[in-house]
C-alpha cells in the first residue's frame, strides 16, 4: 500500500453542510494530507470523533495502522456544498481542533476533487468587539 492510493478528499453523508478535518498521514517515511468530512447537523454530538473514526476505519481496511502508519489531526472547519449552484465554500474553524494552517491548500484539494464546482473560502475572523449589540432599551 502507498499513501498515494488514498483519496485526497472524501465528504460523506450527502447534504449541504459538512464539518471537515484535515488529517496528516505518515507511513514508511511518506507523508500525505487528506480531508475528511461528514454531513453536519446541529443536533449531532461529537461529529469530530465520527470523522476520525470513519477515517481510521478507511485506513485500517488497507492495513495502514498495522504497518506502522500514524494519523494526526491538523484542524478543520465547515463546508457549505451547494449542488444546485455548483459551488463549495469553506469557512469557520473546528471547535475541537481549531483551524487548519493553510486553508488555501485545502480549497485546492477540494477543487481537484470536485472540478465542476467553484470553490471559495474565508478564514475564521475574530469577533469584532465593536460589533456587539448595543443595549437599545437603556434609559439615560
Protein language model regions, located:
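Intrinsic low-complexity, intrinsically disordered or marginally ordered coil/linker segments
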Residues: 1-140
Amino acid at each position: 500500500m502507498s499513501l498515494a492510493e488514498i483519496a485526497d478528499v472524501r465528504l460523506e453523508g450527502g447534504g449541504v453542510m459538512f464539518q471537515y478535518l484535515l488529517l496528516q498521514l505518515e507511513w514508511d517515511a511518506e507523508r500525505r494530507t487528506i480531508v475528511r468530512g461528514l454531513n453536519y447537523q446541529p443536533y449531532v454530538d461529537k461529529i469530530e470523533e465520527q470523522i476520525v473514526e470513519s477515517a481510521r476505519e478507511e485506513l485500517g481496511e488497507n492495513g495502514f495502522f498495522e504497518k506502522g502508519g500514524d494519523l494526526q489531526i491538523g484542524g478543520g472547519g465547515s463546508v457549505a456544498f451547494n449542488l444546485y449552484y455548483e459551488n463549495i465554500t469553506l469557512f469557520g474553524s473546528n471547535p475541537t481542533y481549531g483551524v487548519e494552517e493553510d486553508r488555501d491548500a485545502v480549497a485546492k484539494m477540494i477543487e481537484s476533487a470536485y472540478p465542476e464546482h467553484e470553490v471559495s473560502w474565508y478564514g475564521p475572523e475574530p469577533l469584532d468587539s465593536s460589533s456587539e449589540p448595543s443595549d437599545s432599551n437603556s434609559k439615560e
